[in-house]
Amino acid sequence: MIGKLKGLIDSYGEDYVILDVHGVGYQVHCSSRTLQALPSPGEAATLSIETYVREDQIKLFGFRTDHEREWFRLLQTVQSVGAKVALAVLSTLPPNDLANAIALRDKAAVARTPGVGPKVAERIVSELKDKVPALSNVDPAVVQLSGALDDNRAPRPVTDAISALVNLGYGQPQAAAAIAAAARAAGDDAATAQLIKLGLKELSK
């Protein structure tokens, strides 16, 4: 099985790259985020590879990091999620944002993925919520905030600050993670304006 490929970028397709490894061109399917991050044709690149072997074909999927590949595998443990949907999810949400979305039970963020409806998004969140801590360094403050939001126990300044960041164009998982970190740093009595300021500082790191 192929686990990693290192070579020169030959060309790009809609959802794949041709990687020239010592004169052999490998067609490797990637998320749109991975494709956008790869260099121009003729330049060197390294991809972690997941190899799928079927009766009628061998298909390669490529990732910039082993971590992204682990998420690709994990997503496919969810009912109705195959390789195509898993790549689409990773095209919409990078691993850290996906982890935060799942920790925050943010089905809407996952459902923004083309081809993923509310039911599949709900399955992804519900089936993976207990597996996220083992795979990602999710801030414990995010997990705590998730429970508070679920039970409507989150302080008003916190919810207002999250809404403000979302209105500024940040995704819900990003905004919630930033405000969770801000609230942890500022304390329980922090005002909305202070949380927004600290949250923006977190997002700029």
From Swiss-Prot:
Lineage: superkingdom: Bacteria
GO molecular function: ATP binding; four-way junction DNA binding; four-way junction helicase activity
Region of interest (Flexible linker), ranges: 144-154
UniProt record, GO biological process: DNA recombination; DNA repair
InterPro entries on file: DNA_helicase_Holl-junc_RuvA_I, NA-bd_OB-fold, RuvA, RuvA_2-like, RuvA_C, RuvA_C_sf
Sequence segments annotated as region (Domain I): 1-64
Keyword ATP-binding listed: no
Annotated segments matching region Domain III: 154-205
Subcellular localization: Cytoplasm
Keywords: Cytoplasm, DNA damage, DNA recombination, DNA repair, DNA-binding
Annotated Gene3D superfamilies: 5' to 3' exonuclease, C-terminal subdomain, DNA helicase RuvA subunit, C-terminal domain, Nucleic acid-binding proteins
Main location: cytoplasm
Chain intervals for the UniProt region annotation (Domain II): 65-143
GO cellular component entries: cytoplasm; Holliday junction helicase complex; Holliday junction resolvase complex
Pfam families: HHH_5, RuvA_C, RuvA_N
Family membership noted in the UniProt record: Belongs to the RuvA family.
Subunit: Homotetramer. Forms an RuvA(8)-RuvB(12)-Holliday junction (HJ) complex. HJ DNA is sandwiched between 2 RuvA tetramers; dsDNA enters through RuvA and exits via RuvB. An RuvB hexamer assembles on each DNA strand where it exits the tetramer. Each RuvB hexamer is contacted by two RuvA subunits (via domain III) on 2 adjacent RuvB subunits; this complex drives branch migration. In the full resolvosome a probable DNA-RuvA(4)-RuvB(12)-RuvC(2) complex forms which resolves the HJ.
Function (record text): The RuvA-RuvB-RuvC complex processes Holliday junction (HJ) DNA during genetic recombination and DNA repair, while the RuvA-RuvB complex plays an important role in the rescue of blocked DNA replication forks via replication fork reversal (RFR). RuvA specifically binds to HJ cruciform DNA, conferring on it an open structure. The RuvB hexamer acts as an ATP-dependent pump, pulling dsDNA into and through the RuvAB complex. HJ branch migration allows RuvC to scan DNA until it finds its consensus sequence, where it cleaves and resolves the cruciform DNA.
NCBIfam families documented for this protein: ruvA
Record comment regarding domains: Has three domains with a flexible linker between the domains II and III and assumes an 'L' shape. Domain III is highly mobile and contacts RuvB.
Protein name according to UniProt: Holliday junction branch migration complex subunit RuvA
Species whose genome carries this gene: Rhodopseudomonas palustris (strain BisB5)
